[in-house]
Amino acid sequence: MAEAQRRAVRIIDSEREGKSMPASARIVKEALTFDDVLLVPGHSLVHPKDTDLWSRVTRGVEVRIPFLSAAMDTVTESRMAIQMAREGGLGFIHKNMPVGQQAEEVDRVKRSESGMIMNPITLGVSASLRQALALMTRFSISGVPIVEEDGCLVGIITNRDLQFETDLDLPVRDVMTSEKLVTAPVGTTLDDAERVLHQHRIEKLPVVDESGHLRGLITVKDIFKRRQYPHACKDEHGRLRVGAAIGASGDDLERARVLADAGVDVLVIDTAHGHSEGVLRAVARMREELPNVQLVAGNVGTANGASALAELGVDAIKVGVGPGSICTTRVVTGVGLPQLTAVMDAVDGAAGRVPVISDGGVKFSGDIVKALAAGAETVMMGSMFAGTDEAPGEAFLLEGRRFKTVRGMGSLSAMEEGSADRYFQDEGRKLVPEGIEARVPYKGPVSDVIFQLAGGLRSGMGYCGAATLEELRESASFVRQTSAGLRESHPHDVRITREAPNYHL
């Protein structure tokens, strides 16, 4: 047995000891959630616009804003993940799809923009215009380099070349640009590439070696995106970062390998109960087989759960048992922990070894401030992003207002489509759901939502006198509030006549 798996067995065995306790001692403590507390304002020299929202998702992946989109099939596919990364956060592709499709979603994110596309999509000289058009449509690109069998660049075909062609069965060699083809040598910087693109009024610059073999592609779109989104979350090659969800079954190791080959930056073993034998063994197995992949595991709600995962070498721990707006785990099973206490306990259990992700329970931007002040380094949200343009699904009209659908991965419909294993129910003919399907108001572009959330976070940091999230975690203090205090916190004794973009009940 591999060392990591032996360690998992030791952790499991040690936690089985000492379970018995008197009935009167089984109410362990009081637990709190976001609405139960407020942060105490303090002396501040910090202006909100000067705050720094840099944080870590895992030990090896950083973000410029501490926001993650959840791996839910009504929240995150490639379109959402692309925009989350551009804004400086990170999106996690859900796993309610075949592994090949999930890998393709990851690939779309990695190819969406780049400092230099390292392995550009190409076609051979005998390919048809129909094939070229299909490839451009599939990957949302405007041109394709044409290469010989040995990889030597011979031309490029763009959508302008296809614009007035009626015979799509022609080979690309008859239409492609081959004479006076502008190229750049290996080692060309983006600044140099920008000058060449501008000088020749072209949109794509192939990068070739001394033998004429295609080694990369620089596009004007990527240069524009770099200016438009200067704080984008990117890897060392200038590509947008993306995460993806896997389960804890034996088949998910192969899924993890395929996603790693597709270029995924972070994998999350996404289960309802991360402090279970099956998940601990899966973490140990994944750590042995894919030691270089950034691995998140969850969900947990206790210090013991977080400590067990940290001991097995995960790169981050995801916290939340039942706080989500579309989750019914706590009322169906009677099990869970209010989110603020869960985060604090998990932070204590992690003991600084790995970052903690607070997953769920966010209704307002103030909840994000509280989660980060409690010790989380990032906050994962689902319903908050579900009503945006980038979320999967179409908006619909109801009683004159626009909505989009959101469903928990524990809802009956989601479980029937593949997420039942998240709740350890993949073998039954009947399912016991732990989530619901609902609608949320349409919110427009996710960038608008992120702007409001980041603005609320910056203001909260200003009130607390924290210039960075690390300072917020170290210096913030809470007070408990009564139900009367909570009522006082919200608008009261008035009728709202104009809705604010960051306040909805």
Please name every model-derived segment.
Residues 95-109, 153-166, 197, 207-224, ...:
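Terminal amphipathic helices with adjacent charged low-complexity linkers/tails
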Residues 3-43, 123-124, 185, 195, ...:
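Alpha/beta catalytic cores of nucleotide-metabolism and tRNA/nucleoside-modifying enzymes
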Residues 62-67, 116-120, 236-244, 286-301, ...:
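Short beta-strand/loop segments at the ligand-binding rim of alpha/beta enzyme cores
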Residues 80-81, 254-259, 301-319, 363-377:
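Catalytic cores of alpha/beta
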Residues 71-76, 123-127, 184-188, 208, ...:
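Glycine-rich beta-to-alpha transition loops that act as phosphate-gripper elements at the mouths
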Residues 99-107, 215, 220-232, 251-253, ...:
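Active-site-adjacent beta->alpha loops and helix N-cap segments on the catalytic face
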Residues 51-63, 70-72, 101-141, 146-148, ...:
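Bateman/CBS regulatory modules and CBS-like beta-alpha motifs in cytosolic regions of diverse proteins
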Residues 89-101, 264-276, 318-333, 362-395:
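Glycine-rich phosphate-binding active-site loops on the catalytic face of alpha/beta enzymes
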